A protein has these predicted regions:
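C-terminal substrate-binding/active-site "lid" region of AdoMet-derived donor-dependent transferases
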Residues: 131-182
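Conserved class I S-adenosyl-L-methionine
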Residues: 55-64
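Bacterial N-terminal signal peptides
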Residues: 7-20
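Conserved SAM-binding motif I beta-strand of class I
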Residues: 79-84
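A short SAM/SAH-binding and catalytic strip from SAM-dependent methyltransferases
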Residues: 119-135
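Glycine-rich SAM-binding Motif I of class I
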Residues: 66-70
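S-adenosyl-L-methionine
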Residues: 87-120
Length: 182
């Protein structure tokens, strides 16, 4: 009888531990895109193409180390939010903002960009993969106000033709404006 109780206890313990592991795995996602830093010249090109000003609220989706949001705050006085699913990137971005002394203008959130409200943005920057851009497009169209500027490093949005493209440091940068709602 003692052996059965011990076996049952071990079985329940195993089930409980596995359920904790599953719950943790189910509630966290790995990044859809590997972290590849945007070169400084491309960051500058993206912000110039978007015509960022001190009145802008910039959201960088897949912000990595925060360099785009931080540069927008330093150079143009914009406020901004960086969104990234990777907690290591958020820690790094927050540290970089502290070192740049722009924590009064920027913040970083660990979140799934497909489940995040970025409707306050006047500028959105992206360095994601083509499939992610395509998946994100209807969310951008739904959430963002007409006139919001979108700038993407290296990848377009399929059949949504950019208003402008520029080459910076061997990289194409794409620019769109959210159209009036129909």
């Amino acid at each position: 009888m003692k052996a059965i109780k011990t076996s049952l206890a071990a079985l329940f313990l195993t089930i409980w531990v596995n359920s904790l592991v599953f719950a943790q795995t189910a509630s966290t996602r790995t990044p859809d895109v590997p972290f590849v830093p945007t070169r400084p010249a491309v960051v500058e090109g993206m912000l110039e193409l978007a015509k960022v000003t001190k009145n802008d609220v910039l959201y960088d989706l897949g912000c990595g180390d925060g360099r785009i949001v931080i540069t927008a705050a330093q150079k143009y006085g914009a406020t901004g939010t960086g969104i990234d699913i990777d907690p290591q990137r958020i820690k790094e971005a927050t540290k970089n903002a502290e070192e740049a002394k722009v924590t009064d203008k920027v913040n970083f959130k660990q979140a799934d960009l497909f489940e995040t409200d970025f409707s306050k943005a006047t500028v959105v920057t992206l360095y994601l993969l083509p499939a992610i851009n395509l998946k994100l497009k209807p969310i951008l169209m739904k959430q963002l106000k007409p006139g919001t500027r979108i700038v993407s490093h290296a990848f377009d949005m399929g059949d949504w033709k950019p208003e402008k493209t520029v080459e910076v440091d061997g990289t194409t940068i794409y620019f769109w404006t959210i159209p009036a709602k129909k």
